[in-house]
Each structure stands twice: as C-alpha cells, then as structure tokens.
C-alpha cells in the first residue's frame, strides 16, 4: 500500500519535491495532498502538478502518513502550532528547515514524534539535488529508508550525524548561490570578450557541470584535476594565479564559515 504524502507549502522546494516523487513513479497524484496560502498558488500548482491542494494545513496533516514541512523556517512555529494536535503519533514529519534541531520539534509539538530532518537544495528542481538527512530515535530504519527512497526522486541523499547538518547548509544547501555567482561572473567576462550573453551562460554553466561530474566520477582530487588543465606557461595557470592573488579560496572559505555560523544561531 502506497504512503499518503502531505506537503505543507508548495513553493519552489515543495513543488520540486512533489514533481520529483511523481516523475520517478514513487507516488501518484492521488497519494498527495498539499497546502498553499493563496488561491492563485493553489490553482497554478493544481494545473501544473495535477494534485489536490487546500488552504487548510490541518487537513494535510490529517491526510498524510509522511508530512513534509515545506515552508520557510520563519513559518515553522506558526505551522506547528496549527497542526500539532492533528498530527498522529505514527505520522512521519520531514523538515527541510536549517537550524531546527530534532529536539526543537519535541519542544514545539509538546511530545516526541517521528521526525526526519533534511537539508535539501534548489538543484532538486532539476532532479540534481543534494541533501543531508538525520532522524530521531522514534524513526525506524524501514521508515527512514522509505523517506530516503522518496527523496531519491529529486535528490541524492546521505544520512549524517545531526551535528553536521549546519555544515550541510553551508556546503550544499546555500552553495548553489555561490556557484551561480561564479557562472555569472564567467559569463560576464565572456561577454566582455565579445561572446553573446546567451551563449556565454551556456559555456560557463556547462563547464561547471562537466567539472563537477569529473570530481564525482573520476575519484580524483580536485587539485589533481586542476593540475591536468594547467599546462606549463599556459593560459590556465595564469588565470589560476590571478584567482589565488584575489583570494578566491579564502573568500569561499570565509563565506561558508559565515553561513555555518548563522545556521547554528537559527
């Protein structure tokens, strides 16, 4: 028997998750009920996804075997206050919020429930997400495996210790923004060199995509792969020299440490 999935929130991340579980055949439209605040959002998502939507978060919580809290972190307390008396003890709660610990959910719900904490990222929208996952002691291995299987429809996922979840926020949750800035900067330089902008974005983005695949598929250290591109007295090593002079490594390092610090304080 298929699990009934509830999604409180149907913004970019909620929509990406719903699309992923349906496109991968892990859930049917009849298995899903989602909520959205505005009528226009409900109508739009119903048309795009073919699922049922409601304005009532309680009805989603009552419907679901697995309940995804797909709203922004600042709305979690409000949503939990609304649904806490509706959620059953057997229901699995899946959080996508940074900075909300497993113990925090016990405090907010006023009792210990089955909670799985995740940190997804926006590449889930194209089926290439990366997420960290941890669960409390009430979640069985079978239940965790079920959620991991669902998430595999839109993201790669790894189970980690909860103390590393804030690191996940910095290294994969927020990092698409850093990568987009890098792609944009490369494209700007290409445009300055005379390339049409649309073509510049394609060249820059594909270079990043291909480079990432080389790291994942070759097993080689990124430094070794970098060295393979840098010919003696060539163009690439001069570009690398400028990036080192301008502090590219330290800028990325410090930005991620700031992100990590903010996540820990949330």
Segment roles from a protein language model:
Residues 52-57, 158-160:
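Short acidic-hydrophobic, aromatic-tinged amphipathic segments that line or gate anion-handling sites
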């Amino acid at each position: 028997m298929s699990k009934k999935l509830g999604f409180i929130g149907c913004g970019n991340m909620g929509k990406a998750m719903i699309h992923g579980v349906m496109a991968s055949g892990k859930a049917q439209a009849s298995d899903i009920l989602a909520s959205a605040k505005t009528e226009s959002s409900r109508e739009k998502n119903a048309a795009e996804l073919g699922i049922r939507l409601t304005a009532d978060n309680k009805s989603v919580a009552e419907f679901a075997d697995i309940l995804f809290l797909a709203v922004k972190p600042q709305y979690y307390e409000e949503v939990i206050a609304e649904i806490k008396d509706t959620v059953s003890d057997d229901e699995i709660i899946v959080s996508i919020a940074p900075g909300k610990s497993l113990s925090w959910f016990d405090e907010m719900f006023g009792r210990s429930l089955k909670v799985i904490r995740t940190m997804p990222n926006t590449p889930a929208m194209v089926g290439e997400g990366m997420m960290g996952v941890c669960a409390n002691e009430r979640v069985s291995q079978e239940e965790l495996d079920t959620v991991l299987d669902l998430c595999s429809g839109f993201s790669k996922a790894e189970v980690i210790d909860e103390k590393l979840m804030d690191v996940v926020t910095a290294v994969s949750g927020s990092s698409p923004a850093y990568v987009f800035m890098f792609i944009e900067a490369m494209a700007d330089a290409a445009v300055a060199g005379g390339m049409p902008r649309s073509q510049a974005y394609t060249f820059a983005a594909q270079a990043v995509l291909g480079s990432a695949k080389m790291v994942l598929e070759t097993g080689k250290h990124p430094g070794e792969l970098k060295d393979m591109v840098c010919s003696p007295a060539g163009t690439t090593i001069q570009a690398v020299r400028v990036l080192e002079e301008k502090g590219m490594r330290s800028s990325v390092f410090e930005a991620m440490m700031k992100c990590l610090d903010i996540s820990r304080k949330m």
